[in-house]
Amino acid sequence: MFSEYIAANGEPGRTLRFCTWGGEEEGLWGSIAYVDEMNQDLTENLRLYVNLDMNHVDIDYENRGNSVTLFTNDADDYKHIEAIAEEYKKDNPMMAEKYKINLGLYDGPRGAPNGMPCNSDHCPFVYNLDGGNTIGRAAVCYGSGSLEYHTYLDDISRLNEESLGISATIYGNYMKFLAYNPEQ
């Protein structure tokens, strides 16, 4: 999606950086270490961290849940994500009927019921910038996932590929918007 858009529209005004944390559960290089090492650059330049962690619906969505939840800690980001999600629903009525798309704004202080949860890789990007003096902006998607997540039964067989497209499309379009509109 991005390469085709860049080819047609030129270089964006912002840099998009993609990070994966596949070994973090084994104590390997992860988001906390990355933020520690890149803290000054991230404090000065990070506009939004998008976390797609377990952002799918279980393959047995009829019995195990059919929802994805997209949430952020910034009201302006929420407004844009909400508008893109509504467009997605209009453009993809079968997907919108099949899967429940929830939205949330968690802009309260850390640990508060309305605060951004600190339970995944987005946490250090939100709360560890500039020694904790700068609150970073994040957008996260959680799916209803699978009961086997983080157990010895956690494998690709529970993955519902189709449901990955919801968050990838909504957040991908928002990232594209931010990349080409650096004043936002």
Task: Give the ranges of each region predicted by the language model.
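Generic preference for well-ordered secondary structure
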Residues: 18, 34, 109, 133, ...
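His/Asp/Glu-rich mid-to-C-terminal helical/loop segments that flank catalytic regions of hydrolases
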Residues: 4, 8, 14-16, 144-184
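Extended, hydrophobic alpha-helical segments in both membrane/secreted and soluble proteins
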Residues: 1-6, 14-22, 30-31
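Long, highly charged amphipathic alpha-helices
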Residues: 1, 79-87, 169-173
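Short, well-ordered alpha-helical packing segments
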Residues: 3, 32-36, 172
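Metal-dependent peptidase/peptidase-like ectodomains
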Residues: 11, 23-139
